[in-house]
Amino acid sequence: MPFLDHSMGGESMQVDLDDVDDLFGDGAPLTLPSRPASKRLRQRLDNLRERGCCQTIAWSKSGTIASISPDGQQVQLRYIRANEKDATFSLSEPSPLSSWGTLPGGPLVHLTWSPVNSELAIIDAVGRLLILNFNTTLNRPTLSRRWDSDSLDDSQAIVGTYWLQNYPGPNPRMPPYTPSYAPAVKTGNSNNYHFQMTPIISTGPWHPQANKSALVSITRNGMLKLFWSQYNGKIEETTLELENSIYTDDLVTHAAVCSDRTKTLMVCMATASKQLRIVQVGLNWGTPKAEGAANAPPGNHPLNPTLSKRHLAVTSWFQPGSGDLHMDSSMSKITHIEMLPALLTSPQNKEWSPMIILTVRSFVPEQNSPYAQDTQSIIDRWELLSDQQQTVHSDIDQLGNRRNSVGSPPTNGSKLKKLDPVVVNKIVIGVNLVNFGKVLCFTYNDGSVEYRDRTTMDELHHDVNLDRIESVLDIGFSQSGEPSCLQVALSPTNFSLVQLCEDGQVKWHSIHYTLADIEAINDAQVSALVAGFTIATAQAASQGTQIDDILAVARNFANKDAFATEWVKTMVQMMKITVDYTEDTPHDHLIKNGILQMCLSITNYLGWRGDALPRQSWGKLSMIALNLRNTVIMITLSSNNITLNKTTLTPLDEPEVVNSLVGCVKWSTDLLAWLCDSLFCLFGDPKFMSLLKLPQSAPMTAYLNSQNEIALHLVLCSATRGLLSALCRRISLLDSFSTRAISWYETREKPNINNQNDPRAAAHAALYAAYQRMRRYTSSSLIKADDFDRLLTSLGADIRSAYSAALAGLEKPRSSNSQASQNQNASTQASQETIARGRQHCELGMLLLQAPPPFFVSVVDKFFNNDLKDFRANTDVAKLYFADYSLLEIDNEPQLLENRRARGIRVDLFKRVEISQKSSNTHNGTPLPWRACSRCASVMEDLAPVSTKPGISFLLRSHSNCSCGGRMAVLPQDEVKHN
């Protein structure tokens, strides 16, 4: 470029700034100096070097984001939630938590979530440990373990933690592995993908009771502490001395723990003397000897765990090289340590990859350093190798039953093999093991995120690859945060992250689609999106993880044709989810199909565009199905006996429970009335009735979709028809209960109503009044539940007959040839599987509001012209037409939706009654707070603080999740006012 024009009018002088010669004639490229590290970043690195446990932000599988305040005195709770106005997700405001008062042990320094249930361990500077349980709501925990009795001793400071994984389960038919459905490989030149299922072997040890974990912690003086839950729920402690650290150089600065395929724990400790020490720890729970998971110990058997150890290997983690001459002392200090457990690399040959120990050291140059130095992090790695097989050490040999003992003989000749280090020119602030332990995720202070293969350390997801998909990052998504970052917590799905920034703010960032403009993506890209989202959702389902941040990203593609329905179709086909309930199977099988609930939740959320906008038709069907399921569950739980503290009780003996069910009964009878009214309107529609004379069902379905009509699909689809039938029978059950309760009270208790000496009189009077309200709704219903159930039963029989006739051609004829008789059973089984797949395909399409199979047209024609016609003759059609169905929240008229929103009217998810802030119940003069679903924004009054009776408390605990599967959170009072 022209830099200086010659003053004498000659040619301008050209100066090349890309490469300026220095005094010695060497090329010296001009580069901008790296931004100096801030004071807060340097302080953060000092904290990482001083203690192994100082993670002050963490994200749970259930959705709670916990962070420690900058002053270290309280924990702040957040979660991502859907906005009721436009259905987009955002980060909630913090809910402060500081119920512990003063902190004699110094500030809070570390948070860690249990992978099994919603338990949060909070650790202070001297190692005191508090455990909170978040099973009920996202932001209001209960206390599981106090720390009042913990010692105030610096040597007890915790430098490493590890939660035991989930117990694989007592069901012998349950696979001993977690399925991973990646990669998805494109088949040929089509846009279809084949998902390769890979088994991820579960390695112990585990807590012997399902859905419970235990926390392992390593202290500065080399003590292992095991915090575990007794069968009665009390958390107890067991200890084991790993090292006798009485000298300063022997103190442990950082520690990592992982499970091993020998069903033991492996502990790696980094000491002040720059040593890495590997110790194998055996865990015996003291339970009766049992062979295999099928003979799991009973849940009420007292546990008495014992720990044993064996030292395996020692090496030095720091060996200065020539490149370290000008580095400061920080390079001789670790910031992170991780243990990567052995992985099954070849299930056929039973080959395992070795265990890997990983450490990170980071260097930040001083601003006035005379040397040309760059910011850098050095990632060191060692493999734990075995020279020869030895007999099991005596102190581990007595570990009891097979599940808790060493599964294969450990080695005495173990050694640590140093691998080549990896150097990056930025500061590592976080190391996470993801994708079932196969991938390492590094987060950096500049907000960048990097995924590397655990074995080769090659960077992953760098290039777009639509032919072989391991992660959504392969199909055009990028992940990053903002610069000036001190800590990062990845979501359990890896679809988003939260940052703790230098200014103390917590910020949420989702992955971003960068491959193409979302409005212009082609079919191949949509198919790749479906495959990537399916892999992530299936992995979340197999690990019990909430999928809210997956849905937050999917919201960007909700307007793409068939994205949501193809996503659910692929999920059902890949995970073999049952959607065919044509046969008369018990309703329990349908109700307990939790994966089907997740699929309905996906279409429910993506079909919802905010409370002031109409829902997509398939989203409306999913909403009704989810609410049906929730109501059936609530009535079932209320009707059954429960055992609490060795006492058997029936929730329906409490007036609070009956009053809560009154609204459910009203909602249920309104739903049946609305459904019949919709079907009767179709019966009176000449256009629709004429379509029943056509041989194909596509014209009929197209007309229904144009009218936003879903009633016919609700009764044709076996899953929703089964839920409707279950609801009818629950209504009849409650009608019977209320009739008997009223009769019992009027014949036995009413004469004693004025007996002031009988304390039961007032309670029985309240229960009598509640049952009268329930009976009023069941007896005045416009549609009798028993009659409608018979209508559904008749339709179900016709559908089964139609399936049998239409799919009979798929069944191979039986051969009388004696030579073929040996193949007859196999052939029959194959034919039955083919028929089952055919029905599954048809049922899945109807569940997603697509056209029924063509042979259903005759079934629908008979249903309308015979069964429904006779049913209509015995119904007051006018009352149905003019009835108020606002309780169902199903009317899609924009004006009605806006009016409802303006009045602040909502329907209580629990009691199924209309609520508003003006009409909300009060406690001590204060309106009750509301709980809201993080996924669909449904609300309910928070009755937990005022409901002390066991029956209603039991039901409220069952509503920690919304009907859509999203978690509930308590809203601040100011948010309730604007709701």
Region locations from a protein language model:
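Extended alpha-helical solenoid scaffolds
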Residues: 2-979
